[in-house]
Amino acid sequence: MSQLLPSLVELDQHAQAEPEFATWRVGFGPFEHALETQAAVFRLAHQLVQAGHQPDLASVYRLLQAVDRVASAGLWLVVHMTYARQVHLDGSPLAAEDFKQHPEGHTGGALNMVPAYAGYLALNALTGRTRAWLMGQGHCVAAVDALNLLTGNLHPEQAQAYAGGEAGMNRLLQDFYGYGQAADGSPLAPLGSHVNPHTAGGIAEGGYLGFAELQYAHMPLPGETLVAFLSDGAAEEQRGSDWIPRWWRAEDCGVALPVMIANGRRIEQRTALGTEQGLEDFRQHLSQCGFDPMPFDGRDPAAFVTTLWEMELRLERRVEEKARGILNYPLPMPYGIAETVKGFGFYGAGSNAAHNLPLPGNPSRDEQSRDLFNEHAARLFVAQQELAASLELFTRSRQGRTLERDNPLASRRPPAPTMPKLNYRDDACSPMAAVDRFFVELTAANPALRPRVGNPDELASNRLGGVLKALKHRVIEPESELEAVDGAIITALNEEAVVSACLANQGGLNLVASYEAFCVKMLGVVRQSIIFSRQQKEIGRPAGWLGWPLIATSHTWENGKNQQSHQDTTFCEALLGEMNDMVRVLFPADHNSALALLPSIYQARGELACLVMPKRDRPCYFDQAQAEQLARDGAIVVEEQPGNEALLLIANGSYQLGEMLRAAKRLKEADCAYRLVYLQEPGRFRGPRDHWEVVARASEGVAERLFPDAMEMRVLLTHMRPEVARGHLWPILPDARKCSALGYRNRGGTLDEFGMQFANRASWANVLAACARLRNVPRTALLTRDEAAAVAGKGDPQILRGDA
């Protein structure tokens, strides 16, 4: 650290004057306190007393002694969670029968997280203020679970299962990778291999390395502080994590404190950061990106305390200097680098084996491994009386402040937004115009809800010009009236980064729009978020953040000016495979049907919506009443010609509705009975997979009314791949012999809308060919000879372009 620190002589003199400092500086168990850390603790103690956070220096040093002991006990418990079936609280060696037959755990990373999380807890205790935490390497959750158990920071279900001394600890050990299941197949234990909703204070799974790096700066609101523990492996993997200084603004962001656990190893090999040169290169890279790198001893809980405290002070000073005109954005963002070795504190530290199972064998069967476990665990053991005294200091510090379990980011529930007036139209226009006006008016009506727009590219091209004009790109140096330092639009040619800004903004209003084909790059981070939200719901603590739409536009059927890379329906198909009560997959056909959906999307809690919609002008298919009914029911009858053996035509997608209407016109001319239904929300008509999806289905009787059993011959024309749609929609496509499904067949190229439809056998003429097959009549009963030849691939496709 660059500040002036006391010399060794001064520290020795201070130790003579303050016995508690002398006791602490000796270290405990695996923890040794480097001179630089001792000096930082000296300064920290004086600052805390001067600020009124602590009554005297001795109180600070006693709590730091306590955190050494709590952290050592945390290391001890983590290695027991991996290997042991039960603990010996008297510290006696474990026998063969005390070990698991099949040990499992991400032991090395969890051991590295123990001093980190212990330091976070200690800073909260010392300052009387609860910060939030985030862990990008969610597989290290054993550290958090162990320390939460020791300090009593538990949700009720974990307290019931694991509190109460030795018996509770033994249950924790046995549940950890115990694979127990409830009768319905769900995990039985309130525990997991990654951060989950049972983890006190947990806000993200951390299953994909790198996503926390993209999200942490967008999470806290002003007045809040978030400590983000990050992975050195993710720094190699995730582009965009080094852009945070671009986006952070004191005016609308809370304090974000990133700390990388630089243990230098992936699962199988050393990372670049595992070398001195690699660390130095990384520090230089961070500096060039606008960070203020702060390397420190990642093996010492006290070093985490002092570094986090110093990071807060530095950022506070820089915000003050910005207010005085001394600095401009981007402010140098403090970035802690905790230098350590993988698996510090136990056998095998620094080896590849440290990642998972550091011992050479299974201690339940191998005597050498058993001896090594007992030898190294003994070095971590803290006598119960000594540990209890240390924990008492943590407990006492919680008086008058929020438990870490209940930190603001883990308890998000912004007020319900005021909805703007809905302005329906009766002219042909872009469906995106509905979103454009609605979101501008929504954000204006709710100034207390921080807006974020995720924009990979071409917001104006995607017909969100009003949003762009009102909210502006967030930049450092504006070069047009569409850019501003305080802009709310996060623009980067990186889909994961921009959607992460919105997924992280759980206290505000969000919108993401992208080319449909490129939305696929968002899938992993979106899926991780909705899975976490679903799990919160399942355990009875549903997420409170406001829903918002992911808009897939410039989509497959209207992106013919580009090549087939831009023609991909995978995103909506994949999200349709997720639980329908967590992400609605919607296909508004026109302006009004899009507009009618938006209030329910933004009033939802803990749910997303995927809107697959055109950006080009489309006819007005539905008036206000029809659009609102469609939003309620998920599907609607568009038109009908009664008669015997009526065909049931099902359109899913705006361009598909246009083609179906052309086909219906020809059926009417042929005096053929039919019903045309527009299917806007396919997930409402799927076979539910659990009781939550039952609730998300269409209302009682809607499916039977729209898709009556008497209409056995059915043709679906879908935006998606037909095989995917048919699989999800088997309840309304029950008999494969009497149902035909048409859609995207992975054909494309530089083609216009008609060319895309013809190439994929998804035009109006292909619909009529399917109708003829189902009715067992020749195609020429519904098509001219030339049209039939074109459908068969033996004629001129251009003949199908004209009006039917």
Q: Which residues fall in each region the model found?
A:
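N-terminal leader/propeptide and maturation segments of large enzyme subunits in energy/redox metabolism
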Residues: Q368-A428, N766, C771-V777, D786-K794
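Non-catalytic terminal/interface segments that mediate subunit docking, oligomerization
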Residues: Q65-R69, L75, T82-H88, W133, ...
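A glycine-rich helix N-cap at a beta->alpha junction
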Residues: L154-R171, W248-V259, Q288, E477, ...
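Thiamine diphosphate
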Residues: L172-P190, G201-E205, M219-G223, V227, ...
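Cofactor-binding active-site loop characterized by glycine-rich and histidine/acidic residues
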Residues: L63, V67-P93, Q101-E251, G465-V467, ...
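Glycine-rich phosphate/pyrophosphate-binding loops
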Residues: E213-V227, Q506-L523, V677-Q680, P778-R779
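Active-site nucleophile and cofactor-binding loops and adjacent substrate-binding regions
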Residues: D98-V114, W133-C140, S186-E205, S231-A235, ...
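Intrinsically disordered, low-structural-confidence terminal and linker regions
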Residues: M1-G52
